[in-house]
């Protein structure tokens, strides 16, 4: 083999970063012939040549020309859309047979002068590039006209002339691997829209493979993967029509292949977290917004270029091939071929193009970028929004600036690659990151391959910023309301306040109108909401509810709350809505208070009021309101003496709407204690003095308007802590044994003339055994001369710190029988329950007994997800459990839940026995209920949801709920049916209501109906809202 003539310019591989200050020429050994750069192959049997170029390529490489096939196609028949551009038969270079084992092939033919010009080919250049390409073409034409014929078999002056048939051997043997990436020979026409044909070794990038025919007069070419010219098509079977992906208005199979490759080039799969088990809702896509710091850093960042092969023309256009990449701050452009114009600051890329910036990633056939202006055009592009995550395709994507872009023939979804359960299609989509809005023209929704919605225009958010517009409608069906549809509209009035108006139509009741106003200030969060039915078609009355809520944090020490509520009637909350989140259907509380805290204590100023919404309850049994109430506490160590001083004080004005006794109460309780503590024991003796004074009105005859009560309170609290470490199987545990003794003495004081404004029994549990007063509030001070014995044992996992098992047992022993009762001399207690003369002696579960019930409590965490707990009170006199509860919960913190519980409570005296079937609505404190609730998975992506509350006391179901939910990482559908007790009629017979809830959510786009999540949050213990952390 003889070498070519003298070199015209040099070329060399580029394997390190190349900056904009690229040298005019590289002095690496190479040879050139006319319009070709040539180097010897490694086996020294052929030449490997690359055509010279002066331009940097174009946004859109040329499409195939007319459907004239090459002279021969070889064994595999190519579809018309996969054929190479028209060729002129030429003789291949001498000795250019394929080299066994290397995959190297000689250059293919170059189109003749009859080939279409770039400007007339499909996917031609954009207007911004036409001038540049025109100038490049004219200079090439002039150069080719003046060029002499340099070798036999070549075309003198022809830009795409073939390499020389034979050439003199260079004086020094050259290793081709130093100049051309192994396994690749590329030939590029020297026109503005280059065509690229290449042969590939196994594992090499896709492209054309060309072989000379036996007569060596023409070429047989075969396409592997996407066409490097930028109009790639998957190669189909013979006779199968090709997929017209370039005009497709959906996500095609070829797009899915591109998405797979795009994911492989990203640092991580953005759907990994969203599609993980338990992830309920996509995160807000706001991390793709450039901050001012990002913009400045991008402008100042240098441009870095990497590639396996590079070449510079006239110190202006740098060309790179072989895994080429351009980087500037967060922007990365990667492709098989890159050209960088240093004067125009433009980048052209083609062949497996990959572009990535903050929060966004693109794959495309071609990319034209103006780096300084943050502009670009990508054709046949696939994109991924990493922070949603979401993805889509656009046949043409225009990046107009760093905040604005628009897309032609676009498809969008939040489903991961390979899943197209739902897709949003549009002729054109515009995204404005600055405003957080997008719009689409001629948009239509497709779900499971079925079109379900069309609109000529739609406006949508692209991040979590608040925007005015319609919110997701809600709908449902119930027995008492009929079918109801609610349509809310949101007004983003200002950055610190907004308004939501709602229109709701119920076929059985008529229209309902509501509003919700929110205002956020520097120190306060204010909310005003209300609903009204102008005329309920069933009750023929105006019904509604209203609420005002204001929370303020004025300083680190001062906090305020105002919570005002109004409801028209007691049935409104069950029948229509409980927007206020109220827990009582009898009394509606409104309150306001201000808290001031400091290092040694706190002060609270409070006022409250109770609205009676149940007409069956007389006014006399309505709770007292406090207007105002001032309460404070103080706690401080007295120097180094070891003593601690505590004080509690309260002054309250109690009012009432009826003729009940009213008045003011002042209560002061100072206390001194001397705590002694060590790691294994504690001893806390203390003494307190409680002074209570009343100023009364409407008092009973013969009772003074001023009452005063003073009593000392002595107590000693002591305990020991023993522990031991041991192994149980593979678990390392620590067991503690904690005995506790608590003694209390309070002398007996006659309090029969004292009113009961706010006192009541504590909920009797294990921890109430260690209080110095068995009554809540200051109206009653219990006489106490008793000892409480308690024992607690814990099993602690030493590796995790979890309490695997905690068991406690306690009992009160009376030294002197208690006698102070909760009898109200004025006929009613704050809960509206009239107490008879033999009631009120409710002492730790017993009446006029010398011994209280034995209380036991057990909590165990079987695993991280399983929890079992229970508590019971056993009467030593009757041998009956007078009170008890047990519950088993499974919660894997992924909203897979199951709750099993049972509650039992004996009635108060003079109430029906627990064994008797009481009538619903009768005043009784007895309970005998079971409660089962769950949300458990079955099959793939399916959950069954349910709840069943059953009263063994009334022998009937209190509430039943059943539903199904299908959830994937991009959509969720839920349907629920519910039946529940709605109250009682005039004859005390129970009434029920049934309702159906339906919710459809396309994650990251929209939701139809939002009542299901809010209802399940209240109905199933442990359930979390989609946007709530576990």
Swiss-Prot record:
Gene Ontology biological process? Gram-negative-bacterium-type cell outer membrane assembly; lipopolysaccharide transport
**According to the entry, what is the taxonomic lineage of the organism?**
Bacteria, Pseudomonadati, Pseudomonadota, Gammaproteobacteria, Methylococcales
Where does this protein have compositionally biased stretches of type Pro residues?
161-171
**Quaternary structure annotation from Swiss-Prot or TrEMBL:** Component of the lipopolysaccharide transport and assembly complex. Interacts with LptE and LptA.
Q: Give a short account of what the protein does.
A: Together with LptE, is involved in the assembly of lipopolysaccharide (LPS) at the surface of the outer membrane.
| Annotated compartments | Cell outer membrane
Name the domain of life: Bacteria
Which residues lie in Polar residues bias regions? 78-91
**Keywords from the UniProt entry:** Cell outer membrane, Membrane, Signal
**Record's compositionally biased regions (Acidic residues):** 126-137
The terms describing its cellular component in GO are: cell outer membrane; transporter complex
Q: Which residues form the signal peptide?
A: 1-32
Q: Where is this region: Disordered?
A: 50-213
Family, according to the entry, reads as follows: Belongs to the LptD family.
Q: What name does UniProt use for this protein?
A: LPS-assembly protein LptD
